[in-house]
């Protein structure tokens, strides 16, 4: 959601952001499993933000279950995360799907400072950086996230998809907050 699809379009590329904020490799694998055959990408630009490799993925699982269809990949994700919040949301999500309660729902294109742009980009109103202290932390990679990331890379390579790994810029204060 952080790559402006309009810029790629101006350069002659057809793109789609297949992600959300705080999305971990576990959710990326679900989306890739669900949509790869329809999208058939020739290239994948994958943002490898360290903190998404550190978290458990529960928050993003709730978002994915609530905002996309639910299927065997949703169940697999819930079992991998093994968290009561994910299980409860999955049950609720399947109930909404079975009762067709999501068919008429339409996500608003504008929500607060966020504005959806065709292709999966979310533009945010201009805000000025205000420096502040950021708590120091070690980067501690969650083994499950890293294992899933490796599976994604292996799958994309097996499909002859060009992969570009990027790390979006962060403020120098944020960068210095990592203690290892």
Regions found by a protein language model. Give the residues of each.
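Small-side-chain structural scaffolding
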Residues: 19-21, 28, 84, 89, ...
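Generic detector of short, locally flexible boundary/turn motifs and exposed helical patches
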Residues: 8-13, 127-132, 167
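Extended hydrophobic/aromatic segments used for targeting, binding, or gating
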Residues: 157-180
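Generic hydrophobic/packing signal
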Residues: 22-27, 49, 111-116, 156, ...
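Second-shell loop/turn segments in exported
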Residues: 17-22, 136-142, 175-178
